[in-house]
Amino acid sequence: MSVEITFVEQFQEILQNGKEQIILLNFYAPWAAPCKQMNQVFDQFAKDTKNAVFLKIEAEKFSDIAESFDVNAVPLFVLIHGAKVLARISGANPQKLKAAIDEYIQPLISQISSTNASVETQVNSVQTTNTTSNTSKAPNGLDSELNERLSTLTNAHNVMLFLKGTPSEPACGFSRKLVGLLREQNVQYGFFNILADDSVRQGLKVFSDWPTFPQLYIKGEFVGGLDIVSEMIENGELQEMLPN
């Protein structure tokens, strides 16, 4: 069955706990006729698909979440697995949505469920991948050069904020709120506008294993997004982590 998101913390918790799961996001508007039709289709697909999470998100009500996934029109469906966006399906098109489920969800479910796969098969698969790729890969799967660049960026300052826009002109609500929190705490930090470099933007999702922005790093270690940082400020953890 599908789950209706009713508060931001619920969404963040599902993302945090569902890194190994396949998640399909349905951004909709209750007043739009195409969304009403696709909500019914979405609910039916949710009933028919096991071992995947189907989330419905009212785009205008949760504009910050919508902005973090670059939602410009509804209905929009975003398929994610871990930190990777697998597919985006725009508009009222049940056939395309079903095709994406068949292409991405079903194979991944089979892969996750195949606990009896032989070691030999896994080794052969890795060998095949390695022989067909001339690009050096980091352990997280990123291109080695990009991974090294991200490591350098995240260590550029003791505290680094990766956001949409700049601290003076944030380009999304989440970024604006986190900038405000850091200012209230008198935190000195460096920043990087991920809208200016898509390779950094997409790479950080894998590097941090976190699919949304903003992202805060302290001494090169990923701390979290807006909700996690907010909680850490409330319980005093953030101040303890900050360099003297």
Swiss-Prot record:
**NCBIfam families, per database record:** Grx4 family monothiol glutaredoxin
Location in or out of the cell: Cytoplasm; Nucleus
GO cellular component assignments: cytoplasm; cytosol; nucleus
- Positions binding glutathione in this chain are K164, R201, Q202, G203, L204, K205, L226, D227
Question: What are the GO BP annotations of this UniProt entry?
Answer: intracellular iron ion homeostasis; positive regulation of transcription by RNA polymerase II
Q: How does it assemble?
A: Homodimer. Interacts with php4.
- What is the protein name for this chain? Monothiol glutaredoxin-4
Q: Which organism is it from?
A: Schizosaccharomyces pombe (strain 972 / ATCC 24843)
Q: Which GO terms describe its molecular function?
A: 2 iron, 2 sulfur cluster binding; glutathione disulfide oxidoreductase activity; metal ion binding; protein sequestering activity
